[in-house]
């Protein structure tokens, strides 16, 4: 699982700190890919930079291909800095569920419901918290 997470992260721009994420600039790369394709429909492989949702989708697809039991989860935020946030749950043979980090500490597995899992999933975040803290909003595809 960790190796797959690292492959996904490297394909879509690498590891970022929480502070760097607001200024990652993936929306510019999405626009570039749309212009090149002359379409709003893109392949994940068109992107050199991907946000959490792009990484979560690619991880889910690849995990399914290699038989890793996985679920893609989308955020409850419908506006604000965390709109479109997504992450993956992975399941072990021992009925344990983990959130896999594809953005920050790439490959880390956080037990479901743990402080780290909730932070990664932004479950306790106010929808506009990134804007309030001064970082740019996470916009894009």
Report residues per predicted region.
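Secondary-structure boundary elements
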Residues: 1-45
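Hydrophobic/aromatic-rich core segments of domains that either
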Residues: 50-130
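Long, acidic and serine/threonine-rich low-complexity regions
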Residues: 127-141
């Amino acid at each position: 699982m960790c190796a797959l997470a690292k492959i996904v992260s490297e394909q879509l721009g690498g590891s970022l700190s929480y502070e760097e994420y607001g200024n990652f600039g993936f929306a510019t790369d999405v626009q570039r890919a749309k212009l090149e394709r002359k379409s709003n429909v893109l392949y994940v492989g068109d992107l050199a930079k991907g946000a959490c949702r792009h990484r979560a989708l690619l991880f889910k697809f690849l995990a399914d291909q290699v038989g890793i039991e996985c679920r893609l989860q989308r955020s409850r935020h419908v506006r604000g800095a965390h709109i479109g946030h997504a992450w993956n749950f992975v399941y072990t043979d021992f009925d344990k569920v983990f959130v896999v980090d594809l953005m920050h500490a790439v490959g880390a597995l956080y037990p479901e419901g743990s402080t780290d899992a909730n932070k990664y999933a932004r479950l306790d975040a106010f929808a506009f918290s990134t804007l309030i803290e001064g970082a740019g909003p996470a916009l894009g595809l």
